């Protein structure tokens, strides 16, 4: 169906719904690369005007990719909760925005509507929102998950401890891991990106993390971010797997380029559930996403990068994950050119994820050839923390020596917790205090915690 909008006697045409969504998107290099972006700020404003007047029901009547061609579309439509949708079903996209921002809309109202909001509805309304709108609404969308601790409670900010090493050297990983723990990092997950996807190497890393967590009785979970098929094989061997990781995207074709489909994700989740390793809950999937992934696989179907990203959240939502995060600036300036675009994308992703009911975190990051620097990351992580972001990354010095990109450091989480009065997950916070890492006042204790002297001695004197 085509859409038109007139401004000062000039008519603007949009051939279909996905074209209208793309033209209404805030500027980003991914959409320009794909030839989908508005040709001018005037066209962008007109497209946003036209989008604001569309009924939300249009996204159910006109799927962006026909469900008979795409399993992600089928999942989104088949899992849509009509009862949850009823209170907002008469709204236009513009009225939906006003409802989200209204003081009359309670946090309970937002939570009740989650399963009635499709990813495309979330993406559409985000295109009409300023940054402060994205922050204000996301802050009210609390999403709590559990495995060995409780993540996502209001007033909490968790971190993924990311002790990557370019050769997967056990001592190098252990040093970074201990460094992170001494800064209060790791309550979301201790997660390693392996240098290779070799099952033997991944198994060795999983045993290393399991040993550290068990020896020190750390109330957290581990993950080696291997391909889901590798993790499945290792679970069959009896290797200690806490969380199952996989990168996901918003179209069937993009997921196929990752070597996955929905059935494979379901198989992996069932296998992990059968291990019964969670002490507090059974949220055990960990997904990473990022704007531009479908475009980079030539699998975007003419859909803009941000809407494709929101569709990935529809995939994630089906598997009740413990953690989901956008790796916002990782693909590079071809997709998000500069700090301004990275900041906007991070806020959009967090908003859409939280609105859809996901435990949404963010890898606040950029590549060295982007027009961005650490000050931009300071801005984004602060805005996200104000917005109630579930977790960020903890990388030694913010410089990942294996993935060769810039993220956030252990110190960054301490800064955010200090200036905004945020705390780690409650079980992990209690462990930090018990170990003498924290001083009982949500701050680092002075000196080396006596209970970790042995671990430090092992790293300096022998192989961990």
Functional labels for PLM-detected ranges:
Residues 2-176, 182, 187-464:
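Anaerobic metallocofactor- and corrinoid-dependent redox/one-carbon enzyme cores
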């Amino acid at each position: 169906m085509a859409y038109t909008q007139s401004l000062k006697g000039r008519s603007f045409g949009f051939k279909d719904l996905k074209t209208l969504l793309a033209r209404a998107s805030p500027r980003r290099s991914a959409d320009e690369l794909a030839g989908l972006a508005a040709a001018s700020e005037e066209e962008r404003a007109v497209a946003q005007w036209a989008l604001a007047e569309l009924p939300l029901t249009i996204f159910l009547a006109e799927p962006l990719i026909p469900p008979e061609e795409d399993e992600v579309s089928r999942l989104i439509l088949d899992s849509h909760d009509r009862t949850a949708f009823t209170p907002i079903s008469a709204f236009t996209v513009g009225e939906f925005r006003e409802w989200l921002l209204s003081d009359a809309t309670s946090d309970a109202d937002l939570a009740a509507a989650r399963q009635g909001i499709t990813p495309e509805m979330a993406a559409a309304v985000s295109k009409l929102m300023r940054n402060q709108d994205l922050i204000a609404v996301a802050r009210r969308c609390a999403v709590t998950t559990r495995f060995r601790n409780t993540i996502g409670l209001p007033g909490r900010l968790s971190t993924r401890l990311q002790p990557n090493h370019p050769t997967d050297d056990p001592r190098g990983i252990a040093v970074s891991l201990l460094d992170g723990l001494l800064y209060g990092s790791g309550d979301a997950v201790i997660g390693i990106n392996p240098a290779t996807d070799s099952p033997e190497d991944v198994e060795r890393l999983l045993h290393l993390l399991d040993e550290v967590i068990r020896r020190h009785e750390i109330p957290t979970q581990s993950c080696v971010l291997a391909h889901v098929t590798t993790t499945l094989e290792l679970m069959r061997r009896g290797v200690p797997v806490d969380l199952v990781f996989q990168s996901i995207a918003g179209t069937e074709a993009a997921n196929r380029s990752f070597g996955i489909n929905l059935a494979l994700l379901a198989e992996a989740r069932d296998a992990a559930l059968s291990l019964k390793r969670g002490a507090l809950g059974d949220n055990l999937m960990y997904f990473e996403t990022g704007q531009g992934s479908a475009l980079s696989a030539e699998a975007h179907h003419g859909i803009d990068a941000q809407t494709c990203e929101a569709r990935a959240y529809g995939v994630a939502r089906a598997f009740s994950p413990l953690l989901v995060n956008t790796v916002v600036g990782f693909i590079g300036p071809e997709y998000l050119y500069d700090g301004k675009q990275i900041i906007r994308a991070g806020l959009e992703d967090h908003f859409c994820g939280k609105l859809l009911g996901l435990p949404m975190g963010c890898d606040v990051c950029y590549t060295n050839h982007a027009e961005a620097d650490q000050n931009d990351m300071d801005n984004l992580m602060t805005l996200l923390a104000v917005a109630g972001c579930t977790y960020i990354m903890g990388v030694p010095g913010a410089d990942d020596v294996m993935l060769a990109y810039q993220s956030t450091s252990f110190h960054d989480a301490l800064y955010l917790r200090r200036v905004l009065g945020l705390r780690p997950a409650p079980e992990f916070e209690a462990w930090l205090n018990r170990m003498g890492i924290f001083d009982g006042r949500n701050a680092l204790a002075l000196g080396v915690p006596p209970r970790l002297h042995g671990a430090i001695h092992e790293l300096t004197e022998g192989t961990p």
